[in-house]
Amino acid sequence: MTTTTTKAIILVGGPSKGTRFRPLSLDVPKLLFPIAGKPMIYHHIEACSKVENMKEIILIGFFQESVLSKFISETSKQLNVAIRYINEEKVLGTAGGLYHFRDIILEGGPSEIFVLHSDICCAFPLNDLLQFHKQHGRSCTIMGTEIESAYANQYGCLVRDEKTAELLHYAEKPETFVSNLINCGVYCFSPQFFDVIGKTMIDLKTSGQNITTDYPEITRKGFDVERLRLEQDIFVPLAGTGFISVYPYVGFWRQIKNAGSSVYCQELYLNHFAKTKPEVLKKGNNIIGNVIIDSTASVDPSAIIGPDVYIGPNVKIGKGVRVIHSIILDQTEIKDHACIIYSIIGWQSLIGVWARIEGIPNYTPFLYSQDKRRGVTIFGAGAQANGEIIVSNCIVMPHKQLDRNYNNEIIL
């Protein structure tokens, strides 16, 4: 009996796609930024590695290979799964890149291929998605989830036949309300879906902007067939044609749009870990809620940590410190009685005695309200806050030294 295999593709983008993640992406690529103690895409790869007969995980992007080589080597050994990186020489778009590298992806004859965007946080129920995809027999399945209607137009909106699960309509960030069922950025393809992408590309090349009568019309002005987008240029025209199913995912999900999103995504992952792998969470009399503390970090017993905190390698936490809903990165020192709330403190930073660093909790997808930024306070690498100052709702560039109070500022 022939054993079927699967592959997974993770679309990782490149340096120019991480600008909203600054200042943190100045020191580490966005996809390697630690969320809940692991690089962002580690969570994707770990989920893929748990799929039975996963033959290979392929990362596609336009980073230099050297940027990811150490991470790939270490993660491949740790999870015992083959991982490969493919560098796009030019930006091809999500569908264009998949089709360009189709021979590599389809090598070895996988029966199904997962495709995941790197900038999302969820439980990645890939085995359930795979079973659903096989049951419904279409060449593509989109994982969708329901969110609050007020935020739905920030994402790709799906209209699904409740009886057959077929995708009937797809609208990317529509101006008016279409549906509160949105695209999660996780897909399962059958190999023949690459033929569908190829057919669509041929039709687009032939007609410039319009699909042939086999598919609905595309009306993207100035269309460039070399940069084919999976969502807008493939899913939109194929909706209602019988090619695509929608898997209804019930669970946590969030897009990692900017650096501050990491704090909210960390909270979701830590809540998930409390149920699925509680052994990674720190316990103790000074710990509140879900917390991960690296084994090399030094935390004074009088410091109160949590909930929803990550403390990285070689961090020093002084007496009476309070850390809540925050990420404290490697080799940072938090002096006695400092308070850190809804903040990310970058690598090798220093927070002085009795300093207070705080962000504004904002769980919506809108970073700005009434023209004011409302979000997590972020310190770039090597930044310093002197003792007894308050820094609230700010972004601090790397290696800045703060000697007074700041509020609602980007500190260059």
UniProtKB/Swiss-Prot annotation:
Molecular functions (GO terms): mannose-1-phosphate guanylyltransferase (GTP) activity
Q: Which residues bind GDP-alpha-D-mannose?
A: 88, 255
Parts forming coiled coils? none
Q: Name one GO cellular component term.
A: cytoplasm
Q: Where is this region: Hexapeptide repeat domain?
A: 281-412
The domain of life is Eukaryota
Q: Where is this region: Substrate-binding domain?
A: 6-259
| GO terms, biological process | GDP-mannose biosynthetic process
Question: Which family does the similarity line name?
Answer: Belongs to the transferase hexapeptide repeat family.
Assembly and oligomerization:
Component of the GMPPA-GMPPB mannose-1-phosphate guanylyltransferase complex composed of 4 gmppA subunits and 8 gmppB subunits; the complex is organized into three layers, a central layer made up of 2 gmppA dimers sandwiched between two layers each made up of 2 gmppB dimers.
Comment on protein domains: The N-terminal substrate-binding domain adopts a Rossman-like fold and has a binding pocket for GTP or GDP-alpha-D-mannose. The C-terminal domain consists of a series of tandem hexapeptide repeats that adopt a beta-helix conformation. The beta-helix forms several protein interaction surfaces involved in assembly of the GMPPA-GMPPB mannose-1-phosphate guanylyltransferase complex. Vertebrate orthologs possess a loop extending from the C-terminal domain (C-loop) involved in interaction with other subunits of the GMPPA-GMPPB complex and involved in allosteric inhibition of gmppB that appears to be absent in Dictyostelium.
Q: What is this protein called?
A: Mannose-1-phosphate guanylyltransferase regulatory subunit alpha
From what organism does this protein derive? Dictyostelium discoideum
**Gene this protein is translated from:** gmppA
